[in-house]
């Protein structure tokens, strides 16, 4: 609660979207409809109404944490969102919801930066008067009994006319005169109760006891922040094989040659694991063996050697100029480059020698390596952010700015939950205040408080628990959580990562690879694939492990994508079609509008999404069984689809091209050998109905 808060003449409560009582800004992107809700009330029977006041404050990102040294201090968001200069607002009338005293409104930001909104409550004397007079007329009261009421109405209309442009006032003036003219009460009140006057007063209401609500912030990113398709590749694995069949270390040039295929599949972000020099001290060997053999390339996450640190490129990949050429090639292919920001060091990283204070030094004088007892990681030194925050904070900022200067606008941050939250709040604000288009993906497979806490601090997107959600009830609960936290968290659903090969993929065959791709690409608006997924790579290092056998983290893994495609042993065409469907349907860019539908079979899952702007609607029915057919009766929530229970309609399956005539209940049968899912193009939802659905309480 802000200091000095007092109750207003009109009560304003339960405003949304508000994150952590207004401590952090909510999230949106340019062109996204932001729904606003508030409870507005007053005493007695008098009517109240509400107005949504929206402002754009520019591109300064809120400083939610104080940095070290001379960095500008943190400023509470409640102070930041108070405009320091007069900014012309948008003033939007809010509508009553289904629940008494609940009002709804929407706004659509059209620029990147910080937006604010507040809800103003006010007494609506004309609505109060209209309700009372209509009730008395219906009760049959006489002109004598109603005379005072009608004269009060005339005064109210005259007051209201003062706030209406002169050329538009006539209906109000005429209605007021009619109220003052003796005669039949229905005739006297007719003009004042007419739709024409009601519409005019909707635009120019007479407001009493106006009470300003709290001002709240919404940080608005560019559209990629909400809608993105990621493909992870190791540049060093793109060199192919020599004449003896041995892998050849790839370069930025060979990696650039792989970009057209990635772009053809419809991905718009290519994510690179660390591209820096790899430590030689305690380097890990193949399959994470403690001892590296001659020629072993090591883990890219063991960053730094005598060849450089976080601001250098691995010499076997090329030079910084070669990296610039790779970024340019990606841009030409319609791809953005996401770079891994892994804040950890190999023992021979330059920082270990030059800045031992950035690490934890043990009593014997050695630097502590990473541990997750009983596991030990001698090839990694964790950073200590408390010994010299001024030096370390600014060095990381320098590194991030260095890569931004080389065309990187997206960072995938490795294990951010192992670094202090104030550091991330400070770093993200420093970076986005220079370039608000920079995006950060949080790779935080951790407890909800940390995952969502990092999202609140400014991370654009977040990895999630999706990988481990496989049962129908788990996926339903997970999807509902996506909508619940959409105001501050944007999930990026990865089907696999270099670290995680889920057991469902190890044993589920090609069908499970297709199933998980459907779920990831349609449940959330952002999803990701790690290279090799399209080849159905499924062998783990041992039973019960989620680590890949011959993991690419520790060795080169060139792949024959074209050969697999020619043999019909590739998921590439299916991934391509999924991304085509995502681009075709704005509904699949939404987080808030997911709705699950009933199937009496736990091996089948159904959910729909709609786009508030266009009414575009998609229904997904997907099997969770990759091995055989599943069938059921699907009961649609017709209201959630903007329809009446008795409606019949045609749908088109975007995967197979087949069309069906459906209604409220439908027989469905999914045969994985043919297609693991229906992704159905549904009828458009009309404007008023989709607005009502967006405002569901």
UniProtKB/Swiss-Prot annotation:
Pathway: Glycan biosynthesis; glycogen biosynthesis. The keyword Magnesium does not apply. Alpha-maltose 1-phosphate binds at residues 284, 344, 379, 415, 553-554. The record marks 499 as: Transition state stabilizer. One of its GO terms (biological process) is glycogen biosynthetic process. Its EC number is 2.4.99.16. It is an enzyme of class 2 (transferase). Keywords: Carbohydrate metabolism, Glycogen biosynthesis, Glycogen metabolism, Glycosyltransferase, Transferase. PANTHER family: ALPHA-1,4-GLUCAN:MALTOSE-1-PHOSPHATE MALTOSYLTRANSFERASE, GLYCOSYL HYDROLASE FAMILY 13 CATALYTIC DOMAIN-CONTAINING PROTEIN. Belongs to the glycosyl hydrolase 13 family. GlgE subfamily. This is Alpha-1,4-glucan:maltose-1-phosphate maltosyltransferase. It comes from Mycolicibacterium smegmatis (strain ATCC 700084 / mc(2)155).
